[in-house]
Amino acid sequence: MGKVIGIDLGTTNSCVAVMEGDKVKIIENAEGTRTTPSIVAYKDDEILVGQSAKRQAVTNPNNTLFAIKRLIGRRFDDKVVQKDIGMVPYKIAKADNGDAWVEINGKKLAPPQVSAEILKKMKKTAEDYLGEAVTEAVVTVPAYFNDSQRQATKDAGKIAGLDVKRIINEPTAAALAYGMDKKQGDSTVAVYDLGGGTFDVSIIEIADVDGEQQFEVLATNGDTFLGGEDFDSALIDFLVAEFKKDQDVNLKGDSLAMQRLKEAAEKAKIELSSAQSTEVNLPYITADSSGPKHLVVTISRSKLESLTEELVQRTMGPCKIALEDAGIKIGDIDDVILVGGQTRMPLVQQKVQEFFGQEPRKDVNPDEAVAAGAAIQGAVLSGEKTDVLLLDVTPLTLGIETMGGILTPIIEKNTMIPTKKSQVFSTAEDNQPAVSIQVYQGERKIANQNKQLGRFDLTDIPPAPRGLPQIEVSFDINADGIMNISATDKGTGKAQSIQIKADSGLSDEEVEQMIRDAEANAAEDEKFANLAQVRNEADGRIHAVQKALKDAADKVSDDEKSSVEAAISELEAAAKEDDHEEIKAKLEALDNAFLPVSQKIYADAGASAEGMDPNQFQQGADNAGESNQADDDVVDAEFTEVEDDKK
């Protein structure tokens, strides 16, 4: 088994890491940063991912997708999805199966398909660093993700060309990273994870058992639709209201203005973590018949806190429930770990400190800890690391609907996984030939108030009075937190394996089609990158040869000059077309035409009479390109991004 990388697929930013020896390496992307914006843009038949997508978001808001993780595994009619529709500039559409998808240029895309583009970027980042192909990964998800959301995340990995060896919960991954440097003694930690789109809290016990670190999750709770994006939205709503009050113009319907507001709000929020006030200044935000309008608003830290205090307070409820479920008191918590970029907000830190009665630790990087923990779990799965044991739990109760529409639990929340539990059911009518079982996940007593995972039918039950058939149904949750069901008719001994026919999610055929699409795009991307490379080579060669001709004008005959200039013209014409081989051929023709000239130049200079390699003229241009890459990467990034999107 090769390296198993760890990927934190975040709502706002993503991160990739790998275990090297006994240390975790957070891998920098092609732009030189350790985290990558979880943004995907579709522009002129090109897919941009990360920073390049973020840079053009203001001018392409309808085709720039961000916070797609909030839609993964969700139904279009979910209240939280309906709320998001009014908050994002891109179109959220209803798929044929009722799922929430997005629509770009009239084409519907599934959230796992979009998330796969981010995973591909992470995969390529790791491959560039390791110098080898990467096919296996551990991917993290919010602890409170349900079965559909976990399966959709695995689908995204599959589309990206990754075998997702394990799905692990984000707070658990952060605890693994924290525990790496904590070698002695037992401790109980609370992981408070407030990311871009989700909130989780987990109570985790770390024990030293015969030299092996054992991480046991005692309880977890959270909210999969509460995060930094909501803090941004609260600030955006305030700015829109202030502008309406000042200019009597509503910016809500202007997608370009709203995208500029989003960027400004995010920037202001970050600045207010260290400053007491900041100014949002957006000239020419819009215009009407009276002329252009400018938005200038000064925001204080206290104003931001008043706008978002309710959001912070919402995180306290899950903290209380997690402690109760774990059966421990606040005083039993040894350390509090903050994870997720939103925890940098002073108000969040203050409220967490007040709740747990202690200052949270500052030695865990909130942006990188989750990816680091995923990399540690990857090393465990590959056999590279053997002194860590992870015992996680299922965050939500699993059960079925019984008479009266009540949810009958089969596996209670916070049950350690993997696990398998069974319960015996029977028929409700005489001679009933089949039973239909509705499977739900959630904490509500009324079955249909929970997330329906699907249904299955057990058929061919022999005729018998009601209540007599004994049908044992087993719920089996694997280490990823994903469920399978089997059933046995105890009267006949007939066993049957049941696959949940989910009402939502991608079918195997859809996933396979998306993989084929990704592979086709990969070929196109590679062709585009190769074409760009050979065009750059042609451009550099033409420049170098023209300079040499000018410098050696007195040594070159008219025939030689005409021959070289004709070759240059043919190469310039070829470079405007899309034929890679033709450009290469014209490059070679220019080299051959220039060879007699180069021999003259170097003979006169006392160099070897064998002539020079025309590529030497190109060397300076190549080196110049390398030196620029570390600066602004405005030019180079476009080509880098194409390579990053190889599928």
From Swiss-Prot:
InterPro entries from the UniProt entry: ATPase_NBD, Chaperone_DnaK, Heat_shock_70_CS, HSP70_C_sf, HSP70_peptide-bd_sf, Hsp_70_fam
Gene3D superfamilies: 1.20.1270.10, 3.30.420.40, Actin, Chain A, domain 4, Substrate Binding Domain Of DNAk, Chain A, domain 1
Biased composition (Polar residues): 615-628
Keyword Phosphoprotein on entry: yes
Organism domain of life: Bacteria
Entry's transmembrane regions: none
Disordered: annotated segments: 606-634
Induction remarks: By stress conditions e.g. heat shock.
Modified residues (Phosphothreonine): 198
Gene Ontology molecular-function annotations: ATP binding; ATP-dependent protein folding chaperone; unfolded protein binding
Keywords: ATP-binding, Chaperone, Nucleotide-binding, Phosphoprotein, Stress response
Role played: Acts as a chaperone.
Entry similarity comment: Belongs to the heat shock protein 70 family.
Protein name (database record): Chaperone protein DnaK
Organism: Psychrobacter cryohalolentis (strain ATCC BAA-1226 / DSM 17306 / VKM B-2378 / K5)
Lineage: Bacteria, Pseudomonadati, Pseudomonadota, Gammaproteobacteria, Moraxellales
Gene: dnaK
